[in-house]
């Protein structure tokens, strides 16, 4: 989505380049055996693996969070989903606006005449990314002391529910 805003930076979107400066990327089709081998080779050199595919997608591909951790014990794996594992909604897909509504954020945004409204930025995605960033840093610090990686699980809904609870703390 963000890649297509414009083509002002050497054919790439300014927004995408701004948010991803210094990153390198490649495209792999994890359903192809050769690409899966390439992916596994990259995991062997990685410190962190973050995924936010549809619920169950990594398990169907054979790369669910437990699989990389068996082979690469120092790896920090971060799974981000719409809803927390083990909850009734765990298998549902989610997106920013839906979570804003379900967590109650849309009900406190807008005016008395407009009714509920979405926040002007993708606050759910951004906040969950920031929470993941903090958790990953903590896991990396822990790994420096223990030598062990970690498996982190974050959900869009839980992140927004926590933000919505701040006035009550």
Label the predicted regions:
Residues 139-169:
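Substrate-binding/catalytic subdomain of NAD(P)-dependent oxidoreductase enzymes
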Residues 1-151:
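N-terminal helix-loop segment corresponding to the beta1-alpha1 unit
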């Amino acid at each position: 989505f963000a890649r297509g805003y414009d083509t002002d930076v050497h054919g790439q979107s300014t927004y995408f380049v701004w948010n991803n400066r210094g990153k390198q990327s490649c495209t792999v089709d994890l359903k192809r055996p050769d690409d899966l081998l390439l992916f596994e080779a990259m995991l062997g050199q990685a410190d962190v693996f973050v995924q936010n595919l549809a619920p169950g997608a990594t398990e169907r591909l054979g790369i669910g969070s437990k699989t990389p951790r068996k082979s690469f014990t120092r790896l920090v794996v971060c799974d981000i989903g719409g809803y927390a594992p083990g909850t009734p909604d765990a298998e549902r897909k989610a997106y920013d606006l839906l979570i804003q509504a379900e967590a109650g954020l849309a009900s406190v945004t807008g005016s008395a005449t407009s009714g509920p409204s979405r926040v002007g930025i993708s606050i759910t995605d951004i906040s969950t990314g920031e929470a993941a960033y903090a958790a990953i840093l903590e896991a990396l610090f822990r790994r420096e002391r223990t030598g062990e990686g970690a498996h982190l699980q974050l959900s869009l809904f839980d992140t927004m529910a926590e933000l919505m609870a701040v006035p009550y703390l």
